[in-house]
Amino acid sequence: MNVLVVHGPNLNLLGTREPGIYGVLTLDRINEEISALAEELGCSVSFFQSNSEGAIIDAIQQACGACDGILINPAAYTHTSVAIRDALAAVALPVVEVHLSNIHRREEFRHHSFIAPVAVGQIAGFGADSYLLGLRALFTYIKKEIVTKA
């Protein structure tokens, strides 16, 4: 099983950017934790981070046929990008949306997600653990989907 992990804009600044909201772990450290869990689960992960909407869309499109699912933290694009939402819908892979902070406890403009309607689930508010919970959920979902199709 192959999972693409997509990190959206400004997540490259984790560890220094608003640590009271996003925590002190760097993106590299979060990726290490995701990799360790993936190994434990018996799946492989690849990572992609960009501050560019178009580059994120390209990565999502390239996942079609190469990956079994997508774990995505679209960051600010959660609330603005119909294009990323449409790319996720187009590839028709299982998607889990994750957020470090609880977007529903923050500013009103952060409460709406364009991604949620095309995701199998959303996990928010658990810091870096949101990624680990998301990977476990996606792994379980894909395994059940494989069994159902068999």
Curated annotation (Swiss-Prot):
Keywords: Amino-acid biosynthesis, Aromatic amino acid biosynthesis, Lyase
UniProt binding sites for substrate: N73, H79, D86, L100, S101, R110
Any Pfam family: DHquinase_II
Coiled coil region boundaries: none
Gene3D superfamilies for this protein: Dehydroquinase, class II
Xref: CDD domains: DHQase_II (cd00466)
Reaction catalysis annotation: 3-dehydroquinate = 3-dehydroshikimate + H2O
A biological process from GO: chorismate biosynthetic process
Annotated metabolic or biological route of this protein: Metabolic intermediate biosynthesis; chorismate biosynthesis; chorismate from D-erythrose 4-phosphate and phosphoenolpyruvate: step 3/7
Source organism, top-level taxon: Bacteria
Record-annotated active site: Y22, H99
EC number per UniProt: 4.2.1.10
Site residues by UniProt (Transition state stabilizer): R17
One example GO MF annotation: 3-dehydroquinate dehydratase activity
Enzyme type, top EC level: lyase
Assembly behavior: Homododecamer.
NCBIfam families (alphabetical): aroQ (TIGR01088), PRK05395.1-1 (NF003804), PRK05395.1-2 (NF003805), PRK05395.1-3 (NF003806), PRK05395.1-4 (NF003807)
Biological role stated in the UniProt entry: Catalyzes a trans-dehydration via an enolate intermediate.
UniProt similarity note: Belongs to the type-II 3-dehydroquinase family.
The protein's name: 3-dehydroquinate dehydratase
Species, as recorded: Geobacter metallireducens (strain ATCC 53774 / DSM 7210 / GS-15)
Record gene name: aroQ
